């Protein structure tokens, strides 16, 4: 299966996941999902660094920025693996 197709399938499946299950994930895991999603869909971080007083925005920016140079397909694969490890297995 093509990576992009599998990635889109995972995104569609996540829309149907119980929000309680997602809220039980640690902040670190949620941040990993976020950074791989952004790298997969946008590519390298293209926004200016937020002030550190905006803790959540800065944490997201830092996480995404850490993937600079990662290929979008590689980020899709990581996202898919996170889905399989943290959503499917915990079902």
Task: Indicate where each model-derived feature is located.
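N-terminal alpha-helical modules
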Residues: 1-91
């Amino acid at each position: 299966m093509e990576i992009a197709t599998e990635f889109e399938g995972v995104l569609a499946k996540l829309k149907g996941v119980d929000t309680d299950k997602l809220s039980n994930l640690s902040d670190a895991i949620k941040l990993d999902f976020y950074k791989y999603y952004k790298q997969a869909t946008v590519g390298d971080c293209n926004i200016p660094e937020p002030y550190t007083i905006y803790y959540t925005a800065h944490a997201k920016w830092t996480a995404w920025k850490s993937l600079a140079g990662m290929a979008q397909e590689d980020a899709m694969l990581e996202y898919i693996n996170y889905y399989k490890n943290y959503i499917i297995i915990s079902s």
